[in-house]
Amino acid sequence: MISAVFGKRRSLSRTLTAGTICAALISGYATMASADDGQGATGEAIIHADDHPGNWMTYGRTYSDQRYSPLDQINRSNVGNLKLAWYLDLDTNRGQEGTPLVIDGVMYATTNWSMMKAVDAATGKLLWSYDPRVPGNIADKGCCDTVNRGAAYWNGKVYFGTFDGRLIALDAKTGKLVWSVNTIPPEAELGKQRSYTVDGAPRIAKGRVIIGNGGSEFGARGFVSAFDAETGKVDWRFFTVPNPKNEPDAASDSVLMNKAYQTWSPTGAWTRQGGGGTVWDSIVYDPVADLVYLGVGNGSPWNYKYRSEGKGDNLFLGSIVALKPETGEYVWHFQETPMDQWDFTSDQQIMTLDLPINGETRHVIVHARKNGFFYIIDAKTGEFISGKNYVYVNWASGLDPKTGRPIYNPDALYTLTGKEWYGIPGDLGGHNFAAMAFSPKTGLVYIPAQQVPFLYTNQVGGFTPHPDSWNLGLDMNKVGIPDSPEAKQAFVKDLKGWIVAWDPQKQAEAWRVDHKGPWNGGILATGGDLLFQGLANGEFHAYDATNGSDLFHFAADSGIIAPPVTYLANGKQYVAVEVGWGGIYPFFLGGLARTSGWTVNHSRIIAFSLDGKSGPLPKQNDQGFLPVKPPAQFDSKRTDNGYFQFQTYCAACHGDNAEGAGVLPDLRWSGSIRHEDAFYNVVGRGALTAYGMDRLHGNMNPTEIEDIRQFLIKRANETYQREVDARKNADGIPEQLP
């Protein structure tokens, strides 16, 4: 009990005894201000999470991942009185995607670069902080920012993954290291290519910590691992795609060798690139079915013809796979996108519900996945029940009502036709990692939906991989939007974002809330008939859960992509969210991503209550990277190759066609482009490796790096006056740049 800070609220009971502690020699350190003793949640406590509604004990609050809290002190009648209670500035102004946990008044929040913080949930006072010291050169091994989506809590320990592939257990009271393991075994690496990263939240099931990874864009063979929560010893590992030689190597051996291998070509590029199928987000334990569900990712490479010679369904890409938590043994699977060639992962949030269907209540999985369809699947057997598109789709006309298999639009099979395909949804999906929520009071699922088209174009001349780069099998010179006002205006008209309130019983939309653009935050539903969501334009909103009416908004000054949580501290209800825009949408879409609303990142955690007394957030820079007049001369004979090299190695972080969205440096205005040696010192020699800009000397020669510099000077000259003019409005903030 920690009465000094948390009053007389009853703590969770500790139902498991501490096991063996395994020390690990790993870099990292904790700094501690002061900490009080929160007690340990266990699986039994999480199963009965509603007995402790003031806590947020696991990623989705309960094992069902519904992100619904019964707390109702804050409700429709008084939410307009909500005020900022406290804020805590974070270490880095990059994207923040984490779901904080709150156990007995202590908040455990993971932040960018895999840092962990324990915070007094009533005051925002930092109790301790742990930095695992992720090497800066790991940043370019991941597709979509060095984010972290959250932690797990078990028996007095807090667990989280690091971007360089570790799983760390800390003492929740002190922040001291208990154990640390490398989750990426040597046999998972592809020769010298190590592209695995970890940014998802681990999950706890029956005393095991389960974690996946990402990396399919570079070349990876997906898997999940389960570790003993007390010791860190690996219990089992399940690969999601076969061994290319069809040899045994994990708990997945039997099903991969007997069921999955024949769905792949024996000689496609997957045998060298790993095949993909990384489980980078959704892992759910269901105590009702006693199963662990995995959301399996896209292929590596994306291009189906190159990956598997255009043959087979490629199990278990784009699938939900159910395993036994004790052993990792396969139980069932349902493949949502056979023959994936659009980056239609199944990693999006898996939620379980008890749903009335044809006169009986069935325990089901509901899944609003990237491909634009809302699936209802029997949670115990994997039987397809129904599916309906929740956003506009043009790649399929629907799903087979018996099997759930997509009814493909033949033109969408671009890898087989050899023609370009303007896909909706595009690779970012109708729903991505941003959490959806369910309210048992309304019976609705609330989806942070979006529309971001993508031009799919085959890589010419066959598949040619590039080390430490995206290897999609696409022509990266053509997937970008041309730099013309007409082309950009046409594309911008197709960029959309909404809350879609979906009735799962009717498989129909109930209503929607329109947003300025895509890439908004996750959603929280509460017993006060409220929905909370942060937006890309820096606003934090509360909506009426029955009809979507906007009841409250707050200027957070930075874009929000994280999902909110709610909890009790000293008997008072709070709502909190991590602030900081990032991820692949602003990274790659660059200037076009500003259509969702321009903000400059000032990453922090903010918390609200009905009697908050923090006052407004401090005024900070809101103009971002200012344009600097570039050198006037460039070599036009080198800029075409510079564009190719930039799109291959640089665009995923610094923006399509070298236009940044303000999260990472906009290279058009970098002082280094003025001097050949200065630019090579950064790009070739790695002068800024500690900050996440790894050296590319091993992948490009000095001539190719200089070609990039010439291209950047060209782009700076083409866009300088446009950017200057955009900052001449009353607020000095860039408007949309068509």
UniProtKB/Swiss-Prot annotation:
Keywords: Calcium, Cell membrane, Disulfide bond, Electron transport, Heme, Iron, Membrane, Metal-binding, Oxidoreductase, PQQ, Respiratory chain, Signal, Transport
CC cofactor note: Binds 1 PQQ group per subunit.
Catalyzed reactions: ethanol + a ubiquinone = a ubiquinol + acetaldehyde
Xref: CDD domains: PQQ_ADH_II
Binding site for pyrroloquinoline quinone: 97, 149, 278, 370, 584
Domain of life: Bacteria
Covalent S-S links between cysteines: 143-144
Enzyme Commission code(s) on record: 1.1.5.5
Signal sequence range: 1-35
Binding site for Ca(2+): 217, 298, 343
Names of the cofactor(s): pyrroloquinoline quinone; Ca(2+); heme c
Catalytic site positions: 343 (proton acceptor)
GO annotation, cellular component aspect: outer membrane-bounded periplasmic space; plasma membrane
Molecular functions (GO terms): calcium ion binding; electron transfer activity; heme binding; oxidoreductase activity, acting on CH-OH group of donors
Annotated ranges, domain Cytochrome c: 634-738
Binding site for heme c: 650, 653-654, 693
NADP listed as a keyword: no
Function: Dehydrogenase component of the alcohol dehydrogenase multicomponent enzyme system which is involved in the production of acetic acid and in the ethanol oxidase respiratory chain. Quinohemoprotein alcohol dehydrogenase (ADH) catalyzes the oxidation of ethanol to acetaldehyde by transferring electrons to the ubiquinone embedded in the membrane phospholipids. The electrons transfer from ethanol to membranous ubiquinone occurs from pyrroloquinoline quinone (PQQ) to one heme c in subunit I (AdhA), and finally to two heme c in subunit II (AdhB).
Self-association state and partner proteins as the record states: The alcohol dehydrogenase multicomponent enzyme system is composed of a dehydrogenase subunit I (AdhA) and a cytochrome c subunit II (AdhB).
Family: Belongs to the bacterial PQQ dehydrogenase family.
Stated name of the protein: Alcohol dehydrogenase (quinone), dehydrogenase subunit
Protein source organism: Gluconacetobacter polyoxogenes (Acetobacter polyoxogenes)
